[in-house]
Every structure is written in structure tokens, then in C-alpha cells.
Amino acid sequence: MTVYKVVEASTVTDEALERIINEWVAKGWAFDGVQFAMRESSKRPAMAFVLFTRAAQDE
């Protein structure tokens, strides 16, 4: 079974996204993608949701 992790980022810069991706990949999660939430009044995203996956741990 696949387990999903969603990390919310309210600061959407390349440095912030790189930090989040590197942090969670180092913890054993596989990067799966990014979804951006846009503001109507701006071309820059208001926030980002960084998606990760990994195989479920047997309990």
C-alpha cells in the first residue's frame, strides 16, 4: 500500500521548495509533485502543496 504525505508551503520560493523536498526525501519519502494555489490578483502562487509517497510500513 502507498502512503501519501502533503506538506503545505506558504512561502513559495525556489529555496523554500528545495528545503522541503530535500528534508522529506532525506526522511525516506519519494517526491511526487507540487500543486500551486494561485491568487487572482497576482501571477505568483499564494501557497504550494508538495506531495510525497512511500510504501506503507508493516506494523
Label each residue range with its predicted role.
Residues 1-59:
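Terminus-proximal functional modules
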